[in-house]
Amino acid sequence: MKRKIQDCLAYRLFLLLPLFSFGGCVEIKAPVDYVNPYMGNISHLLVPTYPTVHLPNSMLRIYPQREDYTSNKLKGLPVIVTSHRGNSAFSINPFNSFCDSLEKGSRSSFILYNYDNEKIKPYYYSVFLSDYDIEVKYVPSHQSALYQLDFRAGQPGLLIGATNGELHVEKNKVFGYQQIGSYETRVYLYLETDVVPLQTEEGNTVVMKFPENDKRINLRYGISFISVDQAKKNMEREVAGKDLETLTRTGRTIWNDALGKIQVKGNCEDSKTIFYTSLYRTYERMVCLSEDGQYYSAFDNQVHQD
């Protein structure tokens, strides 16, 4: 009798083992994993939310330059959004030798894309431009960022544009400014590619064409409200010499530290998604404008010490 009881207990324990095994494989989510940047991107009445990519309270932020979530056109790749609901200052249009409209100099061409090929996290953005066979990956820092562009076909090229401003190019470096609306405020750009272009043109739009055998172009840039030199310093301080994976890990850690200040208990995953997405939205404001101990004030158009 005792033997039968032992066998029965052993059998039941054997049946429970798979449950413990599967339970041990359950992924534990960090706070940033609950954030859904697409929540609210389609609005029935007011302006929708935008899937903003940035670090908490940072000066540099971007979101895809499209009409709405369902649009199939991008107004170039974004560089910096200068207001809560404004367009991006500057734009980057990657192209290859098969993109005829861009190749022939249409500076305002849209980029066709499919939102199913897009991935957005608070600290990361990627999109595959299937019509051009170009894969785009992006990660921001506080005042600078990195684009990794993989050209799977044709000769790689870039159009870098500024409306109401000017840009200059020296080998693999692009720098200049764009006026913000009708105000005296300027946003400055300093940009470097890790591949020296074969051919360049400058003006309101810079054209860069690269060797056909260089299929990956890493593009690092800094922005500033003070000067081009300060934009360069911001880039060198934050992203120079760092790759996409390193910056992605750093951004994820920063977001987890910020969102993790509030811990949520409960079994409702949807409620956690709503909470942490809402908390992520609050970090769009206020914005830290300090650049190496100084900041530009739009009230008097002067640079002040912190």
Regions found by a protein language model. Give the residues of each.
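Short, charged low-complexity linear motifs
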Residues: 1-2, 133
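Bacterial N-terminal signal peptides that target proteins for export
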Residues: 2-13
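Aromatic (phenylalanine/tyrosine) cluster motif
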Residues: 11-14, 20-22
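Bacterial Sec-dependent signal peptides at the C-terminal "C-region" and cleavage site
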Residues: 19-29
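Accessory carbohydrate-recognition regions in carbohydrate-active enzymes
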Residues: 28-306
